């Protein structure tokens, strides 16, 4: 990887208020995957040592990336400060009681460092088959499961008789340390944005443009208001993919298939300096929580994390 010239970036200015906290995390998955004890352990150690806010692990049942729940538990036991979340955890197909129990336990043993984030899952037949839910059924499953998980996190006895789940006197203990245990949602389709406004506490899209983030923040906020809710202005972020060299054609084609009218360069930053520029654009439209996400496998994970830290961590407020 080309050497990065060291410098101290100028502080970013928030679009509406200088009091909003900018935070930078680091994520991995797909083709970029430290997937053994040494590689993943050293990555976790670097993130903790350098002062990253959080670690994020993608969920792909059919890929070689680590299972996010296992990876987060490992990180919890290896660190004292670093937060961690799935980017994002597929909810349709999961037993909501077991999911609530696992995440509450993770938050408990980490002393309140878990960051629950859920989504419908990617539009991939093999992935959908792995979770056992038809694409047409995912939204209804999600809409019943998430409120049920929230009720279970209260520690109260829960009775529920729904279309997919029935519970008679189920109680989850221990409760999460965080109260409330806030949930971030992924996705960027209008239906997903409205769901975030109805059910979520924060929004974390990926592979998106600053303009789309600005539009999404408006729709999420408007939907929340229409349902008598509000989303904390600090709870809008983005997972920001980047590459060290040219974007591999296989990724470019996937992006073109997903959004034919979009230039892949608009959603994938080129180099660490390009990554910083993309964060500046996102901050200007109201986002403040970011996950730097390498799309290609770094030749040296340690050097990559060091370079991202040098370029981005001074921007945290």
Where in the sequence are the language-model features?
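N-terminal beta1-alpha1-beta2 module of alpha/beta enzyme domains
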Residues: 1-79, 181, 295-298
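Acidic (Asp/Glu)-rich catalytic clusters
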Residues: 14-15, 45-49, 72-83, 103-114, ...
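Flexible, glycine-rich active-site loops centered on histidine and acidic residues
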Residues: 15-36, 93-159, 206-207, 211-212, ...
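Active-site mouth loops of central-metabolism enzymes
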Residues: 24-38, 89-97, 177-188, 260-273
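Short, acidic/polar
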Residues: 34-47, 102, 185-195, 268-282
């Amino acid at each position: 990887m080309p050497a990065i010239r060291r410098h101290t970036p100028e502080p970013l200015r928030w679009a509406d208020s200088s009091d909003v906290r900018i935070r930078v995390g680091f994520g991995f998955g797909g083709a970029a995957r430290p997937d053994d004890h040494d590689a993943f352990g050293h990555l976790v150690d670097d993130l903790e040592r350098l002062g990253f806010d959080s670690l994020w692990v993608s969920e792909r049942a059919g890929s070689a990336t680590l299972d996010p729940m296992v990876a987060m538990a490992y990180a919890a036991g290896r660190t004292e400060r670093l937060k961690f979340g799935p980017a994002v955890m597929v909810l349709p197909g999961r037993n909501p009681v077991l999911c609530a129990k696992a995440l509450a336990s993770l938050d408990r043993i980490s002393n309140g460092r878990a960051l629950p984030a859920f989504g419908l899952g990617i539009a991939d037949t093999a992935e959908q088959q792995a979770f056992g839910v038809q694409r047409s059924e995912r939204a209804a499953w999600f809409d019943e499961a998430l409120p049920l998980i929230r009720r279970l996190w209260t520690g109260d006895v829960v009775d529920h008789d729904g279309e997919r789940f029935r519970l008679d006197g189920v109680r989850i203990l221990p409760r999460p340390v965080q109260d409330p245990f806030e949930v971030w949602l992924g996705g960027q389709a209008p239906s997903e944005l409205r769901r975030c406004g109805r059910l979520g506490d924060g929004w974390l899209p990926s592979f998106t443009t600053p303009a789309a983030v600005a539009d999404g923040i408006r729709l999420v906020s408007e939907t929340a208001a229409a349902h008598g809710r509000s989303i904390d202005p600090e709870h809008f972020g983005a997972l920001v993919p980047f590459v060290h060299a040219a974007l591999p054609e296989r990724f470019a084609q996937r992006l073109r298939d997903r959004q034919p009218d979009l230039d892949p360069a608009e959603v994938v930053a080129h180099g660490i300096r390009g990554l910083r520029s993309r964060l500046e654009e996102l901050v200007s439209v109201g986002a403040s929580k970011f996950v730097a996400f390498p799309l290609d496998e770094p030749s040296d994970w340690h050097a990559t994390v060091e370079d991202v830290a040098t370029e981005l961590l001074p921007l945290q407020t």
